[in-house]
């Protein structure tokens, strides 16, 4: 990051953090298992018994096979108290091709540890103004944020996974990033048509009406995080402007048009507290100072909020 004088200020954003992560000493398998058990314990404390997680990107120096084996050993030892659907995070097509060549595929595994989708992180976040927007930030017009992939690399990853029969889940917070993801999905499905692909958009926050229609048309899954309204109620119009904000976080519209919309907490960004997320889904306000409601017509009923954490999450996994 840069300060107001254009000097480096010591902040690292998104991919720029990779060298720092790579310098962290890699844990051995027993240490990995201890971390997993601590995570299970914390999730159980909130009543959570199943999760979707992208562990491969935590320690870049550890091969994915070590993560998988650690989970399998915990399951064999009877210690895995959370069902894990592994979202497989890769950044290079060759990594994914090798993963598939090694015999991995969405659905492979057991009820306690199962390979899930290819996971891609398409852009950053609204808070730090790193989500990729088409028209720039309303409070910083020259800043559009940025994508974390070139269009070519994202397309190569999406096409490879789709052709192999793998599910895909892509983080997209800004509308320009969402354009990229929808284009890549559309191209891949034209090349290799599939019916029950369950490809999805993770977060799906800043969006335009035309994009909501494309999501419905492609029968995509949306992995929403209603808990984000707790913070974003304070900044959404400031960041996006009134026009884009009016069609963003439109999860009720998507649901009413037949799109499967699940809910999660994005832990560790937020606490794994499903009840807090349900509260935000129903009230569309922040939790404690009750800012909002933001687009109250997008509120879920209590049953819809509960379903989003249970039935709809099962559809996404």
How would you label these PLM feature ranges?
Residues 110-130, 218-230:
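Non-cysteine beta-strand/loop elements that form the S-adenosyl-L-methionine
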Residues 158-169, 176-199, 204, 209-220, ...:
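His/Asp/Glu-enriched, well-ordered alpha-helical/loop segment
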Residues 74-79, 103-113, 190-194, 215-219:
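Acidic (Asp/Glu)-rich catalytic clusters
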Residues 1-101, 120, 125-177, 197-198, ...:
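Divalent metal-binding segments
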